[in-house]
Structures are given as C-alpha cells and as structure tokens.
Amino acid sequence: MTAPPRIAFLASPAEPAVAARARLTQRYGDHALDSADIVCALGGDGFMLQTLHRHGASDKPVFGMKLGSVGFLMNQYRDNEDDLLERLQRAEPAYLRPLEMQVQTESGASAGSLAYNEVSLLRQTRQAAHLSIDLNGQTRIAELIGDGVMVATPAGSTAYNYSAHGPILPLGSHTLALTPIAPYRPRRWRGAILKADTEVRFRVLDPYKRPVSVTADSHEIRDVVEVTIRESAQRQVTLLFDPEHNLEERIFSEQFAV
C-alpha cells in the first residue's frame, strides 16, 4: 500500500486561509517544507505567486486552493477536506517557466528577479515613457512612447497583459506576449507574440526627465535605464490542478468569456 503524500500547508494571512490551514493540518498532519512531497498553498493568486517566488527552487509540486479574492492559479477550496488526497492523486500537472529579469538603474546598480506572470515597465511621473525595444540584439522599435510595456508568460497572459489588450497565450505554446501599455506612438503597434527563447531588451531613452520603473510580478525597481528579459532555462515549477478545471482549460475559456 502506497503511503499518503506528506503535505506542507502554507496559508496567506487572511483569516479564511489561516482557519482552513488549521483544519487541514489537523486532518493530514503538519509537515515542514523540506520533508514534504507536495505544497498546498491556501489563499489567492498573489499568495500563489509569493509561494512560487519563495519556494519554487524546492522542486515541490504546488496545489493551490482559493481562499482569496482572485484564484486563476488556484483550485476551488471545498469545505469537505476528506477528499484532498483523492484530488491530489487525480491532479494534472502544469509546468511553468518564469521570466528572468536583469536591470541596470540610473545609479549604476544592477539587480535581477524572476516573474511567473509578467515583467512590466511603467512611467513614474505624468511624463510618458520613451523606450526602445531590441529583440535578440536587433532594434525592432527605436522609440515607443506611452505609459509603458510588458512581457507576459502564457500563465500571466490572462492577467495584466489581457487588461492591456494583449493576447491570451495557450499554455505550452512556448511563446511570450510583448504588449504596450497605452501606446501613443507608434500608433498602430499593438504588440507581438514572441518565441519563448527571445531575449527582450528595453532601454529608457530619457531616464532623467522621464523616469521609468520595472516590476517583476510584485517586485518593483525604480529609475531603471535598461531591462533585459528572457525565459529561464533552469527554473521550472509544477502546479497541480483538478482535471475538470485544469489551467489549460481556464486559459482557453478566458478567450470566450462574455
């Protein structure tokens, strides 16, 4: 007989998530992350992203349950916790590769971060951002004027990217969305779909008069002058989903939401 998986339950600070964790650990035990087989994240999408950033290198599959305001990356939480082991056994994996971001700031400092949803550049003041865009070392747009621009993964393409009128990308398509944010010029440019191995480099053309910040998921860096983005070749995380509502189906369904 196969032993049940050891589960590490992580909860957001929200009261419903904390209460659910107490009930689940009483039922299934409370295992430390380093000795667990599976991570169960209780909260919303923000907490899921936080969990991936903090523990993604552990290579533990993550099964999320929605106890927050937004739960696109989560499964439904059910009051009957007795079926959790069956759900985990039936769960289907989704493999996500984050974006790697490298930044140079106006002060000369360097920084880096990962993003599972998107990397977005935004103007810091009322002045529009002026940016250039290079793809694999070739300048594709010499000057983009607008509020900003972003690069989104397939998993993140239904979030901020979609709100900015970017395309929804199928999971496993090995593509990225390059989407301008409120572009003024070029007027007719509405973004591009890139191969996942494309290196994207943004340069801020007037960083003193028109400062720009960059955010990788929730990690913001201000006063940037150059940002380079590529899909990570080393890091990959595994999310687990109920088969009747897996991530691929959710992304597909978003394209027909009315």
From Swiss-Prot:
Involved in the regulation of the intracellular balance of NAD and NADP, and is a key enzyme in the biosynthesis of NADP. Catalyzes specifically the phosphorylation on 2'-hydroxyl of the adenosine moiety of NAD to yield NADP. NCBIfam families: PRK04761.1. Its cofactor is a divalent metal cation. InterPro entries: ATP-NAD_kinase_N, ATP-NAD_kinase_PpnK-typ_C, NAD/diacylglycerol_kinase_sf, NADK. SUPFAM superfamilies: NAD kinase/diacylglycerol kinase-like. The gene is nadK. Gene3D superfamilies: Probable inorganic polyphosphate/atp-NAD kinase, domain 1, Probable inorganic polyphosphate/atp-NAD kinase, domain 2. Pfam families: NAD_kinase (PF01513), NAD_kinase_C (PF20143). This is NAD kinase. Its main location: cytoplasm. It comes from Xanthomonas axonopodis pv. citri (strain 306). NAD(+) binds at residues 45-46, 117-118, 147, 155, 158-163, 182. Keywords: ATP-binding, Cytoplasm, Kinase, NAD, NADP, Nucleotide-binding, Transferase. The keyword Kinase applies. Transmembrane segments: none annotated. The active site is at residue 45.
